[in-house]
Amino acid sequence: MDGNSLLSVPSNLESSRMYDVLEPQQGRGCGSSGSGPGNSITACKKVLRSNSLLESTDYWLQNQRMPCQIGFVEDKSENCASVCFVNLDVNKDECSTEHLQQKLVNVSPDLPKLISSMNVQQPKENEIVVLSGLASGNLQADFEVSQCPWLPDICLVQCARGNRPNSTNCIIFEINKFLIGLELVQERQLHLETNILKLEDDTNCSLSSIEEDFLTASEHLEEESEVDESRNDYENINVSANVLESKQLKGATQVEWNCNKEKWLYALEDKYINKYPTPLIKTERSPENLTKNTALQSLDPSAKPSQWKREAVGNGRQATHYYHSEAFKGQMEKSQALYIPKDAYFSMMDKDVPSACAVAEQRSNLNPGDHEDTRNALPPRQDGEVTTGKYATNLAESVLQDAFIRLSQSQSTLPQESAVSVSVGSSLLPSCYSTKDTVVSRSWNELPKIVVVQSPDGSDAAPQPGISSWPEMEVSVETSSILSGENSSRQPQSALEVALACAATVIGTISSPQATERLKMEQVVSNFPPGSSGALQTQAPQGLKEPSINEYSFPSALCGMTQVASAVAVCGLGEREEVTCSVAPSGSLPPAAEASEAMPPLCGLASMELGKEAIAKGLLKEAALVLTRPNTYSSIGDFLDSMNRRIMETASKSQTLCSENVVRNELAHTLSNVILRHSIDEVHHKNMIIDPNDNRHSSEILDTLMESTNQLLLDVICFTFKKMSHIVRLGECPAVLSKETIRRRETEPSCQPSDPGASQAWTKATESSSSSPLSNSHNTSLVINNLVDGMYSKQDKGGVRPGLFKNPTLQSQLSRSHRVPDSSTATTSSKEIYLKGIAGEDTKSPHHSENECRASSEGQRSPTVSQSRSGSQEAEESIHPNTQEKYNCATSRINEVQVNLSLLGDDLLLPAQSTLQTKHPDIYCITDFAEELADTVVSMATEIAAICLDNSSGKQPWFCAWKRGSEFLMTPNVPCRSLKRKKESQGSGTAVRKHKPPRLSEIKRKTDEHPELKEKLMNRVVDESMNLEDVPDSVNLFANEVAAKIMNLTEFSMVDGMWQAQGYPRNRLLSGDRWSRLKASSCESIPEEDSEARAYVNSLGLMSTLSQPVSRASSVSKQSSCESITDEFSRFMVNQMENEGRGFELLLDYYAGKNASSILNSAMQQACRKSDHLSVRPSCPSKQSSTESITEEFYRYMLRDIERDSRESASSRRSSQDWTAGLLSPSLRSPVCHRQSSMPDSRSPCSRLTVNVPIKANSLDGFAQNCPQDFLSVQPVSSASSSGLCKSDSCLYRRGGTDHITNMLIHETWASSIEALMRKNKIIVDDAEEADTEPVSGGSPSQAEKCANRLAASRMCSGPTLLVQESLDCPRKDSVTECKQPPVSSLSKTASLTNHSPLDSKKETSSCQDPVPINHKRRSLCSREVPLIQIETDQREACAGEPEPFLSKSSLLEEAEGHSNDKNIPDVVRGGDTAVSACQIHSDSLDTRDVPEAEASTEARAPDEAPNPPSSSEESTGSWTQLANEEDNPDDTSSFLQLSERSMSNGNSSATSSLGIMDLDIYQESMPSSPMINELVEEKKILKGQSESTEAPASGPPTGTASPQRSLLVINFDLEPECPDAELRATLQWIAASELGIPTIYFKKSQENRIEKFLDVVQLVHRKSWKVGDIFHAVVQYCKMHEEQKDGRLSLFDWLLELG
């Protein structure tokens, strides 16, 4: 429910497709919208996620939905919901021109304002802003839409194509945007239809939608009765709100109304939350909104006060109503306060109501009186303040937008408290009260300092004290929010919120210094009364910050920026810590804090952290710029502009988590450690006498420490920037500086600052503290903790954030440190531990002590603190006696850390896994775990590789410790990830030698030169690893496991033999060992495999993909496994992955492909090795892309070789069969891996190892997408392998579990390749074919069938990779799916088939003849009958009839595939394989799952088959059974193609195996576009008869797609008519509508001036029985052709008609 609940029309599809972000801009510029009182304008920004299934070209190419009807309306669309896609693209920046304005006004009077409010952030290509509830403009009038009770949802679309008119990526983006718009309209329409279609009901509709959202949330709560109650309450609230809205909103903007409604929703949610603490995702979302609103308000108190005020007022009203409805009299009063946010808040503050609320209110409404006035004058004021206000708003939005998105993403994972905290913003005051009463009542009283009620709406959720306090903190002061908020909530969300609040505050201060100052003053005043020194202090810092802001001194602004940056960094980095650290300055908060700690949020996803880090980075950059170049900005406006831009850029830019280089990290760590140590020492010396356990003392210590640290950091920053300015001016680096830097680096590495990010955070925090000294030690400690935590978190990238500071810092630091330096140092080197402990722990201990003190003050926390204290004290003591004292305060935290450490292991060397587990499970992120695991795996692999490469060279790899001692080995293992990033930082001696592992080139050279060396080393490693198993040490055990996984011990002999026999150094080592691992256990092997594969993949796919000057693509053999695994390379890979950011899927894809290819290679080699009949050529020049690592030539060679050998030796067959069985033994994988279907298929009785063409690795994308579908998750292995998940798989891991990925990869690869190969073999072998045919037709088990059965059995043994698959005919499906997924291989296969079809059409036919057997096959999954894909001889003949086209196509494909040679054999084999696959697919397709697999094949053929799909049978039929029936009529169906197509249609799931955009391009390249389409068209014509039935449905509402959904009227509105390709857009909208199952979409005749042609095209499509996939393919081909400027740039319709 990311942000869907925020949408008036939530969409599940949307949620899966994109992140919904309710735009704070909702209310912007809508004041004068003049829409009816009942109307509400809802703005929702949807961000398309690149990983979504609908973004995969595969999906669309294989889409078998029937195209919907196209209609044209002249003047009215009576029952049509309408959607207007406004294309904001303009060649010239005319957005501000009257002309464009007028155009927008034509659409809706509200539009220009909304758009201008969004102008600062033009929607990106992957974003669409959905506006609903706009007043209708002339556009509607043209349609006489007045007849339509509802207004069209206006979708603002930034044409994704931009200047790259027709790239596939853009096309898919466009389709997805249209999907979103159409889907929203559909949903809205449904809502409207459910309500009376009256204007007044429009409001009801929104309310109902909100209600629905709420209901959805409640479903999550699973409190039906409660939900009903809430619903009723909510309705009441809505009603009252409506009334109020009618009255007040008439004064206020409609937007406000919307905001209010949403706020109500939030309030309701909050209420619900109050009733049921259960976390509401929605609630979380609402907090986001609240936060946004609040943040916005904070951002520009003076600029947007009116707006905020309105919102606040509205929120207050809403809250009030809500509370009334709730019958919370007290809350009502509070709501009233909210209602009059300014006054209420003030009064509340006076009352000692959570000062946070008061502060928030103040912040929102700097001047209560003004607020009131402002409220009234809001619209005018808004206009007056438009410039600054808008700017501030935009800035705030830009700053907060991504953060909110992240928040929304992360919040769902938050514990209920977190959720509450999120919503706290809304219900802060009321909830504060209730919360205060419940959990934090005393803390509220005690902690008025928590002033985070940014928007009263948030208050609703505030019920949970921690949460409310948390948001309040955010609002009131960055620092204070961090401190107090963290104290109370420390929810990860809180952390982010705090950061956001800080950012908002900063922005607000910058934009309206006076207001900020006032607010600050008020906050200080209000905070003080509560008596929460922390709050006062917090506010004081703000005051410090803001007073200067009065005259807007850049220093103060920068200070604020720095604070924000540090807060963001801390939040992003230490979000978990924050949660854990929810150290309420006062005792009351601690409970909440503890609770939050108890439920550390699962947040801290890389993306969130990245975003926060990015924001912090942007802020820091601005600060640096200002300090360095004071004259850079001529005015505050410039500065704000730059600030806004920077923040937007950094926030929007995809970040890489591990991008920091080790040196820089270490330097940063060192600096931070030095600074912290220095500060701590200073404080320690100052307070040596003071009892560290004394809370006051600890507070003082914390304050002192914070001041010292802040001062240090500020000085550092100032000096640095000063020197920087010199450098900038002089253009050279002062020698002194250089020396200093070098010296510092030399010195500090010993300290090994935990994390550059941390140091940065510290620096920032310190700077902010320095600039705005935190009078509040709590604040300081919080900041420090946050910073520390942030540093650590950053270091870990969300490794451990359990306690913000208390545990999290220690934990994260320890875990990070442990993992990194600390882990090794802690156990390994007392010195390092000492240093680091002093630096890190000491640093932490003060923080901890602060926290502890705070905790003590909080009381509740103290127990926890004390608990952790004992453990951590010892460590502390061991670390540093003095530190220990500090630790006494921090002890609790430290102890917790210690506890964590103890969990980690006394040595802190526990495997990363242990560390992860140690970390708060909730807090510990999957990402962290995956990262750690990946690091561990990579480091292990690297170690092994290094050992193998050169254990004896004297360069002992850091992991040489294998034998030597668990501590060393463990050290590397534990921090494997850290090691990866900073091997040098490893405390353990050898571990420190990050450079020891041989260079890639070195390794490669050595391995190539001395394969025996590798073998020898590997053997030694194996032996050593075996010995290691004896070590009881958990670390050793873990290392041992890793080693064993990396190379399954049982498989070593095979691996060794393979290595010895093979000249394939890389494949031998990597794949052999991977393969063995794979065999050992899919689960266990998977993680290592993943890491290695990832490295492997990265080395190949990434390098080639990333245009790395690496010739790895040429041939896998060129890569030595060692090389791919070296730490260096692993780091590179990880960095690549991280850098890729959005390319994650691609990388994963490559990774999967590489994985599969490596597995296949190793398996093949081993198999060949075992068979003794095939020797794999170590290297083959490769035409194939690196993703296919094994080149086509190599495959062909192998095929020939294998075939020849297999013919020659039966024993080899036996062995190969055994081998294949072994390979299959791991659990089946989702089709994802199919692309690598190069595995020899031992199934065939001949057990010839025929290798399918490697399929593009892009299927992983699909796999990733599939993951969400439960295929992957079904696999039991997933949990186990997830532990071994590589970081690179983190996203996959999240999605479906790495295990699934690996399983899928392996199994898919094996199954697909093996089955396909076997099938091919069968096909190749007449006997086998006959046997296959017999089983199909006769059902008698032929050898082929037996093979298939064996394969199936092996698969089943391996464990149904996917339960779904099992049900679907796992074996077939796997292969099919695999086939499906690799479009290239599919294409090649298809080509083969196509070529083969004519060649082997009979065979195919015979094999395919038994469609029923195919169905049976389904059943026979168990029976293992191998239904052959019955490719009708007629169809085959037809194909033969079109042999040239097919052949040409095939040849083209093959050529593209690099299959050109051996067409007959490979093709036949492939074809046979494909046929087999198809058969399997049939059987599978019966499962539907297989169908997708078939689709995969089809996908390859997608262009050709796309035409076939109609013939394949109505997509609706999509079942193999039907296909089988059709196939019964050989004439009617080209079964294989049909199957493929059908599978395509069936297998939207199969579509999930997306090629990925890149792949699609490649795919297109591989397939001749026009010929393919022509072929397809021909094929379709052939199939046309079959598809006639389909055509009929096409003419009517598509049977398959037909849905209760009503038709939609699509209005396209272009600011610049010549901009978009109207035909292309209409076609894409057609595709989108078809995908949504909309029976008919109407276009405005006046808009589609080429109606005739459009209708002709529609006719053509229906006549050809094209499916959506065919249309899409044609569009893609057209775009490709268009890009190539072919065909004289025919218009799309002309081109399609010509094609037809």
From Swiss-Prot:
Highly expressed in heart. Both isoforms abundantly expressed in ventricle. Also expressed in spleen, ovary and brain. Residues 839-855 have a biased composition (Basic and acidic residues). GO terms for cellular component: cytoplasm; mitochondrion. It is found in: Cytoplasm. Pfam families: AKAP_110 (PF05716). The keyword Cytoplasm applies. Residues 822-831, 857-873, 1383-1398, 1586-1604 have a biased composition (Polar residues). It comes from the Eukaryota. Residues 929-946 are annotated as: PKA-RII subunit binding domain. GO terms for molecular function: protein kinase A binding. InterPro entries: AKAP_110_C (IPR018292), SPHK1-interactor_AKAP_110 (IPR008382). Residues 364-385, 742-778, 793-885, 980-1006, 1374-1414, 1481-1535, 1585-1604 are annotated as: Disordered. The modification Phosphoserine is found at residues 1025, 1085, 1107, 1120-1121, 1124, 1259, 1288. Keywords: Cytoplasm, Phosphoprotein. Residues 768-778 have a biased composition (Low complexity). Interacts (via the PKA-RII subunit binding domain) with the RI subunit of PKA. Interacts with SPHK1; the interaction greatly reduces SPHK1 activity. RII-binding site, predicted to form an amphipathic helix, could participate in protein-protein interactions with a complementary surface on the R-subunit dimer. Belongs to the AKAP110 family. Anchoring protein that binds preferentially to the type I regulatory subunit of c-AMP-dependent protein kinase (PKA type I) and targets it to distinct subcellular compartments. May act as a converging factor linking cAMP and sphingosine signaling pathways. Plays a regulatory role in the modulation of SPHK1. This is A-kinase anchor protein SPHKAP. The gene is SPHKAP.
